[in-house]
């Protein structure tokens, strides 16, 4: 999918957590309704068949429970996208990335292989660490191949790993430095790799021979190996579609660094100028190039500059999950899955405890027809109504975001305090309370946006009886 990813190491985050976040964006002209569910062991397939390809394989008989954000309609496959399992291991898959003809000539894509549709279902229920996730997915890639190029994130309380596929059967992975964050658009990202450091770098067994055989290393002999040069792209499209997204995220998280939005040398990871919060992650994944000439809603640019770069906060985002694995917490509340549906400049992030058996209907009961009975369609309505007059509605949107996320933090603090006091807490009930609150606030926002948008219609007239 046409997504944007940010990964935050535990020493770069405000609370010592690891954070993995990604927008799932549909293709241009398409929109994909999503829902959040819990997949219990009895619901996990023992023999898996893909819809997008002819791939199939037997799965282990001991899956763990895990959260999932599948397509609501299911006609194109599962597309589970993001979740946390009962071992508090998280996975986000996938970020569609680029490749090049040299790689594809050496290791062609495999039409019968796996893709984004399949990966979470095949891996997340069976792993007990982020590293295990890399190794399981890597083994499947080597055995079955893939029909597309993808980046995949795995995280646990201690580590975040980022894996990128190379051609049909190869892969490479790097552990995110603890004191750094990673920004990754739809482009091959890893720009440094050490073959002699398996603690922080992993790859398919024959990758070094593969590189040597097909002359893929484009670095000089005295330089470190740069996988982005070997396996990635430097296309004109990347300068319009990909590198600007990295630039604007790093501009916010490292304002002291001056960079070119069209540069191919933007770093895969950076140490932020201060620690990163959940709100920061929400902000950068909602970015439309605020305070630059590239902002389509701004006043600084020209009609041309406002349309030149692809925003992160785009109209066709299906869902966004922040997988927040917190240290030094009771295990049942260590993992939080913050969820948003729809276009990011117009929504909020809602926290859910993941060690549960069900998800509230407002987030789980998405269906084909437009309705205000669920979070997905209500957010889509708000975005479509507010977009033509964004600056008029901006204060209402900001207030809604601040108030609902404050309520989310308050809920997390209250539940932790209860558990530490020895009280019993029903986490499904707490999730339901949060959902009910957000449903009320979202309906209130929709009412206000609709009223204001109606008064801004082109056919309005100031005189009345």
UniProtKB/Swiss-Prot annotation:
Catalytic activity: an L-aminoacyl-L-amino acid + H2O = 2 an L-alpha-amino acid
GO terms of biological process kind: proteolysis
Family: Belongs to the peptidase C69 family.
Protein name: Probable dipeptidase A
Molecular function (Gene Ontology), one example: dipeptidase activity
EC number: 3.4.13.19
Keywords associated with the record: Dipeptidase, Hydrolase, Protease
Species in which this protein is naturally found: Streptococcus pyogenes serotype M3 (strain ATCC BAA-595 / MGAS315)
Keyword Hydrolase: yes
Active site per the UniProt annotation: 3
InterPro entries: C69_dipept_A-like, Peptidase_C69
